[in-house]
Regions:
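C-terminal ends and interior cores of transmembrane alpha-helices
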Residues: 99-115
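Intracellular loop-helix junctions on the cytosolic face of multi-pass helical membrane proteins
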Residues: 1-59, 204-207, 212-249
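A membrane-interface helix-boundary motif in multi-pass transporters
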Residues: 182-214
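Helix-loop junctions at membrane interfaces in 12-TM secondary transporters
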Residues: 110-124, 134-140
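A late C-terminal transmembrane helix in Major Facilitator Superfamily
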Residues: 153-188
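Residue-level signature of mid-helix packing/kink "hotspots" within the transmembrane helices
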Residues: 70-78, 174
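Helix-to-loop junctions at the C-terminal end of transmembrane segments
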Residues: 75-92
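Loop-to-transmembrane helix entry
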Residues: 54-72, 119, 199-207
Length: 249
């Protein structure tokens, strides 16, 4: 019944008004920015096929690196709810997770330059394990952002906010695909050639080793400012509102 009430309230908003409500929520903008960076990260990891083929000279390694990403992510997703409870919220978990991810990707860079593939696989898995909690609690974070909009502006935007978060995915995915193509073209890469110029090989290293690390650092910076749970509690305490407000609205 409360859910129907929320939907009715949201239906009264025009597209422009809903957009203004979302833009005024700094935490929502942070989530969108993080989504875009995640998609750019994924695009560079996907471009790893070029790196495996031309730098490591074994395109079959791409499948192994895919496993090194996916298995730790699944493990992290399983344990995320427990860790959220243990650390009393998502902020600390997300921060610690991405600190681990940054360390992992930094060590991937080191292992890449010394040419140690087993170490690259291990540190890729470490980075993925650190990224998992954020992927596991994203929806809960969006719910907290929606609560922040209600607390600060008195408006329900739950449905709109969930729908619009796909914006970051679409924008990031489109930009990521385009950037991969542009960078490879600028480097002088020609797919039909049996050999590639050094400029292309250097670009492949930059795209697969350095850009994912840079994107993880940027995401960590954003997450360090995304303590929306604490902000919501501060506002509710200031106004004398119960902590179970989400169940009442």
């Amino acid at each position: 019944m409360n859910e129907g009430k929320t939907q009715d309230n949201e239906e009264k908003y025009g597209l422009i008004q809903a957009f203004k409500l979302l833009v005024k929520n700094k935490y929502y903008m942070m989530i969108c920015g993080t989504y875009i960076l995640q998609q750019l990260y994924s695009a560079m990891i996907g471009a790893g096929l070029f790196y495996m083929t031309w730098v490591l000279k074994n395109k079959n390694l791409f499948g192994w690196f895919a496993w090194a990403v996916n298995i730790p992510l699944i493990i992290a997703l399983i344990f995320t709810p427990t860790l959220v409870g243990k650390w009393k919220g998502m902020y600390k978990l997300n921060m610690r997770g991405y600190m681990l991810a940054v360390i992992g990707r930094a060590l991937v860079v080191v292992a890449g330059y010394i040419g140690n593939v087993p170490l690259m696989l291990v540190f890729t898995a470490v980075a993925a394990l650190g990224q998992g909690p954020w992927q596991g609690d994203m929806n809960a974070m969006i719910a907290s952002c929606s609560e922040y909009t209600y607390l600060t502006q008195g408006k329900h935007v739950d449905g709109t906010m969930y729908s619009c978060t796909s914006l970051g995915v679409k924008i990031g995915g489109g930009i990521g695909t385009a950037v991969v193509g542009w960078l490879m073209e600028l480097s002088g890469y020609v797919g039909k050639n049996t050999t590639q110029p050094q400029s292309a090989l250097d670009m492949m290293q930059f795209m697969y080793l350095w850009l994912p690390l840079i994107f993880d650092v940027l995401i960590l910076v954003i997450l360090s400012k995304m303590n929306v749970e604490a902000e919501n509690e501060r506002i509710k305490l200031q106004r004398g509102i119960g902590s179970d407000i989400r169940h009442e609205i």
